Regions:
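N-terminal non-catalytic structural scaffold regions of very large proteins
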Residues: 1-92, 111-112, 117, 125, ...
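Short alpha-helical elements within RNA-binding folds
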Residues: 95-103, 112
């Protein structure tokens, strides 16, 4: 018996559980996920490679098999990326233009130059439907001139 829960997650044979998406790794549909039974706060959904999860004592004993609900395109999940590029006029604008054309909602933007002022570090959080959409956004930002790296972060 598969039971759908809020958050777009399906858990084998369990209903009435409080489900939440873990903030430490922010999984999105398409990520390999696992449920972690917390003490008093229901089940936290983590990416399988979450270092925070693996740091928990005896964590394997508290894991549940979970999967993403199919055809779950209406939910929005938060993704975080770090962008590193040349600190040039218009870089932030170019990055935000890509995001506004490809995502539903930008949550946070933090841009800072390096100490020598030559490069910029930009952290952005935004709403995303799934992993393939996130990959598309990352690929488009990588094509912005003078962007040297784009990587997904946990928050």
């Amino acid at each position: 018996l598969k039971v759908k829960h809020e958050g777009g997650v399906v858990i084998q044979g369990a209903s009435g559980l409080l489900i939440r998406i873990a903030k430490c790794c922010n999984p999105v549909p398409g990520d390999d996920i696992v449920g972690y039974i917390t003490k008093g706060r229901g089940v936290a959904i983590h990416r399988q490679d979450c270092m925070n999860l693996k740091a928990q004592e005896n964590y394997e004993q508290r894991l549940l098999d979970v999967e993403w609900e199919e055809n779950n395109s209406t939910k929005e999940y938060t993704a975080h990326i770090d962008i590193y590029g040349l600190n040039r006029s218009g870089l932030l604008n170019d990055v935000l233009q890509v995001l506004s054309n490809t995502t539903k909602n930008i949550s946070t933007v933090n841009a800072q130059p390096t100490k020598d002022m030559k490069f910029a570090n930009i952290h952005v959080s935004f709403g995303i439907a799934n992993l393939s959409m996130l990959t598309t956004v990352v690929d488009k930002i990588k094509s912005v001139p003078e962007v040297y790296s784009v990587k997904r972060t946990n928050g």
